[in-house]
Amino acid sequence: MYSNKENVNILTALLVKEKITKAVVCPGSRNSPIVHNLCACPEIECYPVTDERSAGFVALGMTLADNEPVVVCVTSGSALLNLAPAAAEAFYQKRPLIIISADRPAQWIDQQDGQTLQQHRALEPNVRKSVTLPEPHNEEERWYCNRLVNEALNAVRLNDGSPVHINVPISEPLFEYDVPKLPDERNIFMLHATTDSICVYEMAADFFRGKKLMFVLGQLTPEVVGNSLEAIEALKKVAVVIQEKLADDDIGPAQPIDEVLKMIGEDEAYHPDHLIYIGGTIVSKRLRQFLRECKCKMSIVVNGIDEFCDTFMHTTDMIQGLPEDVIGIFANETEGVKKRDFVTLWDKAFDKALAIRKTIRPRFSQMLAVKAFHEKMREEAVDGELFYGNSSAVRLGNIFSDQYIYVNRGVNGIEGSLSTAVGYAIAHQEEEDVYCVIGDLSFFYDQNALWNESLPPNLSILLLNNGGGGIFHQLPGLERSPYRDSAIAAQHTTSAEGICQTHDIVYLSARNEEELDKSLDKLFNSEEGPVLLEVFTNAEEDTQALKDYYQAF
């Protein structure tokens, strides 16, 4: 029988799946559930050592014998600090040492309770990874606990071996052993990708044996996308490839991702069974939710070195490497792979959604302003780079842009969007025009980007001003708060006209569709620069325009 502590059982189950066979265990009551489980596992041999400092080096010596990871487990408090010398030695010798410490619950740290100190990250920087496990109370916390253990156990094998620290808070009662078997935990397998990586080629071959194949491309630089265009086209012949304009350097309509997801509802025919996620963040919350609901037999995430992202909560395999390398490897494995009915199903849905999109003419709103902006760019054959602000602005760009979008999506903050566009425009002022589409809060928050002696003439700004944070009008339930507009959405009556006068920026404005059309003509044909077009809209009308748009699908 095993302990009834769920985080302890998740940890134990994954140690077994990782084929850990040796554990040095030290005495204590708080770590007794862990020690009990280790001793109860027939796959793990336990070696009791009383002195923690010695125990750490005993475990280190075991790793030298066969170069396999070894556990050393201690109780809470200063017992953990006694492992610091062994952790440091293991770090510099590159030894795979798994340090497991029991801990008191977080609420009892620094409360003059017995055997307590700040244990999280206590051994850094001399361990490769430090994690503190939650005590799970729901499925999301169970997933989080599983992910953290996987993260640590994968890190222990990095770079020929490294020590890691897994800290395990355990609440009382401690001594209940009534669980008959360990849970069947998800074990995430990690590979390192190079262009001659045989294991990654084998994984790609396994992937293409699936029936419902999907690639999701998160934010990628235009250089990476450009270098991978042929490979991406090869993938599209056999798999569904989802890419927002943050990962699409092709000139053409934006993929109607949210629109299709609205159309298909809960139809599982559209769910992939083999999924690979490459690149950075995706904008669409609807897409993230959709993919989290999919039950994939194989779910691969491509991460950078020392990254461990499990965005869709069902990762089975991870590849650490460059996106273009992995895209190229998988594209090379498409030879002889037949196009699946799954691809045809999605292609028809995309075509239908694009046809509907063409028929929609929004009311005067931010949506119309962005649509008209991109239509005018096409009419005038404008060649330039696009920068978008976050929140509502980039979501509209992902509907109407037909070219690559730059956006600060790493953290998704509203600060710095304008400054980033200014920086790019300065660096490229002799080569190309730069257009920044931005919401009012993001613009006014970052207006000092224009207080700049180097402000270049090749910068044009489309400012969407609806008197506050428009996205807060789109969040269901927030309308019930009487403080939404004044305190949450930062309602205001500010205009950019005075700012433009101060910084010698050509100022244009529009308050209706006719003014918008005329001002866009001036924006794209102005011989002076920089130039700013401020479009004034109503937040409620903006919200309704968005609702009307999605109701059409």
Language-model segment annotations:
Residues 8-11, 29-30, 34-39, 347-431:
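Active-site diphosphate/adenylate-binding microenvironment
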Residues 82, 217-300, 402-430, 444-448, ...:
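Glycine-rich, anion-gripping cofactor-binding loops and their flanking helix/strand elements
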Residues 101-152, 242-349, 453, 475-476:
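Glycine-rich, acidic loop regions that bind phosphate or pyrophosphate groups
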Residues 1-2, 291-390, 511-553:
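Phosphate/pyrophosphate-binding active-site segments
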Residues 2-89:
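N-terminal cofactor/phosphate-binding cores enriched in small/glycine residues
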Residues 148-151, 155-210:
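Conformationally flexible catalytic loops at phosphate/diphosphate-handling active centers
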Residues 100, 107-118, 399-553:
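Thiamine diphosphate
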Residues 21-24, 45-47, 65-104, 271-279, ...:
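A short, small-residue-rich loop immediately preceding and capping a beta-strand
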